[in-house]
């Protein structure tokens, strides 16, 4: 799941020039780190034949370490959120489920902290809602 989300974000124009990895972001400017905050099952249904359908939400946090240029960084965060919404609407988001349409949201972009070394750390919250269908295997 992290691999798919990282590959998806690597296509984002707002993240060009950044080194994107799984895990926390280091102190070096132009780096980004992604990790999964967890998965929540929103709905679970089971039919008489044992087929289980789950609607899930995976939550991720993306941290970016950038030089302190407030206007440029604010625009970068907005551009990323707009791009993610457009990709999701067009059906070009990461495929996390195996049935139905998936919805991806990037939201709550904000500055987390500014460091004395002239860099700032920003966070963006990513949520992906998807459906997984499980069928009981018979022998």
Put a short name on every predicted segment.
Residues 1-25, 40-139:
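Charged, amphipathic alpha-helical segments and their flanking helix caps
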Residues 30-39:
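A short, hydrophobic beta-strand-centered structural micro-motif
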């Amino acid at each position: 799941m992290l691999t798919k989300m990282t590959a998806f974000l690597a296509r984002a124009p707002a993240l060009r020039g950044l080194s994107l990895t799984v895990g926390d972001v280091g102190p070096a400017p132009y780096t980004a780190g992604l990790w999964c905050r967890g998965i929540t099952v929103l709905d679970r249904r089971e039919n008489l034949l044992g087929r289980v359908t789950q609607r899930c939400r995976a939550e991720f946090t993306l941290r970016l370490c950038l030089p302190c240029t407030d206007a440029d960084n604010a625009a970068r965060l907005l551009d990323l959120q707009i791009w993610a919404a457009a990709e999701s609407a067009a059906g070009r988001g990461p495929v996390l489920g195996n049935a139905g349409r998936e919805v991806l949201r990037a939201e709550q972009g904000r500055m987390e902290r500014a460091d004395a070394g002239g860099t700032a750390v920003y966070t963006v919250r990513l949520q992906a809602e998807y459906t997984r269908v499980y069928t009981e295997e018979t022998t």
